[in-house]
């Protein structure tokens, strides 16, 4: 639909200008930016009042978009990722040196996910790569469940790409690729 394509094109243009973008994901509204824009990363962390040591998630429309951050993984690790995506599965992968410090936080790993939300997939395809994804809320507050919640929390500090949530009841599972440990169900 042309209206959706136009809204996505506007969102991509905003991201390229360094904007913070709020968008619906599978379960909650996400807040993101260009993962290679240090100023946008710093603004996102400050706006959320998030501890920068925690790091952030990269969300992609397909696994190929994450390739620069996955370089160095072996075939078994890649197969494990591929069989769980797309979907609500976030993996902690060893940082190969590609991730910006604010993206990684104090960790030696990076959180990555391939979304199965159609709007997120279209957005990442139009952007040409993954985006930062963090729940759209201030630290310690519940995540936004609607565009109205986003506006109430952040006002005009973010660009909004309106759409429907994906129907999942909870945020993604988080697992460590090296240990296999599940950190959040």
UniProtKB/Swiss-Prot annotation:
Residues 5-185 form the YrdC-like domain. GO terms for molecular function: ATP binding; double-stranded RNA binding; L-threonylcarbamoyladenylate synthase; tRNA binding. GO terms for cellular component: cytoplasm. The keyword Transmembrane does not apply. SUPFAM superfamilies: YrdC/RibB (SSF55821). It catalyses: L-threonine + hydrogencarbonate + ATP = L-threonylcarbamoyladenylate + diphosphate + H2O. InterPro entries: DHBP_synth_RibB-like_a/b_dom, Sua5-like_dom, TC-AMP_synthase, TC-AMP_synthase_SUA5. GO terms for biological process: regulation of translational fidelity; tRNA threonylcarbamoyladenosine modification. Its EC number is 2.7.7.87. It is found in: Cytoplasm. Pfam families: Sua5_yciO_yrdC (PF01300). Keywords: ATP-binding, Cytoplasm, Nucleotide-binding, Nucleotidyltransferase, Transferase, tRNA processing. The keyword Transferase applies. Gene3D superfamilies: DHBP synthase. It is an enzyme of class 2 (transferase). Belongs to the SUA5 family. TsaC subfamily. Required for the formation of a threonylcarbamoyl group on adenosine at position 37 (t(6)A37) in tRNAs that read codons beginning with adenine. Catalyzes the conversion of L-threonine, HCO(3)(-)/CO(2) and ATP to give threonylcarbamoyl-AMP (TC-AMP) as the acyladenylate intermediate, with the release of diphosphate. HAMAP family: TsaC (MF_01852). This is Threonylcarbamoyl-AMP synthase. The lineage of its organism: Bacteria, Pseudomonadati, Pseudomonadota, Gammaproteobacteria, Oceanospirillales.
